[in-house]
Amino acid sequence: MLNQFSRTELLFGKEAMEKLANSRVAVFGIGGVGGYTVEALVRSGIGKLDLIDDDKVCLTNLNRQIIATRSTVGKYKVDVMKDRILDINPKAEVNVHKCFYLPETRDEFDFSQYDYVVDAVDTVTAKIQLVMEAKEAGVPIISSMGAGNKLDPTAFQVADIYKTSVCPLAKVMRRELKKRGIKKLKVVYSQETPTRPIEDMAISCRTNCICPPGAAHKCTERRDIPGSTAFVPSVVGLIIAGEVIKDLAGKK
């Protein structure tokens, strides 16, 4: 019967679509990368999603985040994303977690219940812990490397973490994961040399923070504020979603 996933089924087949509908994917970080990942996952037929993020939509998110509009500023990102998911597929099961994933909060999550984990967070400590937990649970995970300060969406590619180069975040991850005995990790990274942001205090979030009241992470507390565009993190998110869908559907 013709349905909203019929065009996708033409490529994957009925059996694969049923598998996607029964798959549960956890996406950590619902920002510029994670938001587009979730968008593509639900539109591709993933039936169960866990959204993890404690941040609220900020005016400065409008330049790149799919959930950011004037009407959503000040709302929790996971709540906005959940509403969007259910508007696309009312049958989807969505669990929201308003928390920032760190080693201290890991006990709140049972990774064994996930079929796939997406790491779309920025903090190295959180990324490492996510990888460790997923590997221990035997759950596939894909991790986003640096998407900030980049201008070339065509420079991103999928690779094992130990085959990456150029990306500063990937370099740190290689070192830290090697220390912990992690042998491999699928990542999306860029071979583009990062662009140095213009130092202009008038447009710096560090000196002119406009985060909504109650926002979890004040820009004034951040060491660096990376530059961003609409056409880079979105591409990273879509690449990640493609890898998740193809892996779960057995299309490799």
PLM segments and residue spans:
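N-terminal charged helix/coil linker that caps or initiates catalytic domains
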Residues: 1-26
